[in-house]
Amino acid sequence: MEYKKTIRSDTFMIGCASDREQLDALIEDEHCEYRWILGGSDLVIERDFTVEKMRIDGEDIPIIDAKKTHRGYEVWFGSEKLKPKINREVKIEIEILTKKAKGNRTFPVYLLYPTRGLEIKFHYENANLRNVRAESFFAGRHPQAAVSSKRGKSIEIQLSNEEWVFPTSGVIFIWDV
């Protein structure tokens, strides 16, 4: 996913919770840029949730720490290069690799903060899913999402860099098994 926002710090975290209590704790942390809940008795949070890429304005941001805490699994990023960008709008790119039970038949992505411009890609080529589709719900002036799909491979949702969307917006990917 990628979007634009004003950053307030040169360090931030991406978190993965195993229950609602942990997720609530991650939501309360102002340094948590993205959070996810990973449910399933056979899943191991450190193994089944991976941050593949974290970039700001096209630059890779290094992992400075990754650990399991009372809030779940936390992956911390930071760089001295980000200090001049504090209180400025930047383009954030996050790529996550995670497992999701096919039987749930949905994959929701929610926005908790005002966001300008957006790109969300859902790759399912190796997941053996059928009839994959996206339902978006964007709060804003007149946000019009462009949806493109590669049958059997991926769906991409994009909003122009000129469009703002507001909290409680998002997209739900739905499929048949």
Report the location of each language-model feature.
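Lumenal/extracellular ectodomains and adaptor appendage modules
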Residues: 1-177
